[in-house]
């Protein structure tokens, strides 16, 4: 095969130009409409943290999608914001821990009452995953909770307390109905 260096160079330059190009993206975060310019390869995590100042979104695994600390809720489902391109979020409804903290959701109280956070690094990802679960199933079994939390890592090994807090929040949700 004959390699054409000029063609190779042109493709590389075109690809590089595409990643530098900025796109207008509009989405709703914690009930507020946001308009941002993003690069094609920019993760949602970086946009939320750096452009919008929402620092509950963490990065424990270096953007590998392996820890759950960057979890947000998008259109009702938990997603890893480190592996979701911001350009793909146009029109989305996004919830972060900052939005949950301002609500009267039972998870906020049960997480505090159970001393769920030790170092606190994983807490936003866990609590948003739990909220998405409880929004769809307010009476989850322990196995349901474990399955939902399967993508979240707690460096302190505090898993049993997360489960207890989620069960108690589910009970409070069921009592409200």
Question: What residue spans do the PLM features occupy?
Answer:
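Signature of N-terminal electron-transfer/Fe-S-associated modules in redox systems
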Residues: 2-177
């Amino acid at each position: 095969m004959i390699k054409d260096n000029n063609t190779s160079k042109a493709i590389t330059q075109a690809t590089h130009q595409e990643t530098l190009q900025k796109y207008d993206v509009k989405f709703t975060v914690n009930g507020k409409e946001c308009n941002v310019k993003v690069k094609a390869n920019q993760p949602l995590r970086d946009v939320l943290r750096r452009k919008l100042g929402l620092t509950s979104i963490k990065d424990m695994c270096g953007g590998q999608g392996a820890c759950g600390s960057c979890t947000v809720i998008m259109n009702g489902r938990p997603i890893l914001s480190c592996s979701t391109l911001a350009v793909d979020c146009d029109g989305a409804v996004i919830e972060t821990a900052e939005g949950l903290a301002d609500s009267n959701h039972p998870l906020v109280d049960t997480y505090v009452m159970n001393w769920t956070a030790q170092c606190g690094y994983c807490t936003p990802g866990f609590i948003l995953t739990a909220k998405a679960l409880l929004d769809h199933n307010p009476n989850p079994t322990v196995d349901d909770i474990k399955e939902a939390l399967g993508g979240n890592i707690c460096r302190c090994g505090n898993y049993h307390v997360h489960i207890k807090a989620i069960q108690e929040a589910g009970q409070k949700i069921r009592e409200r109905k």
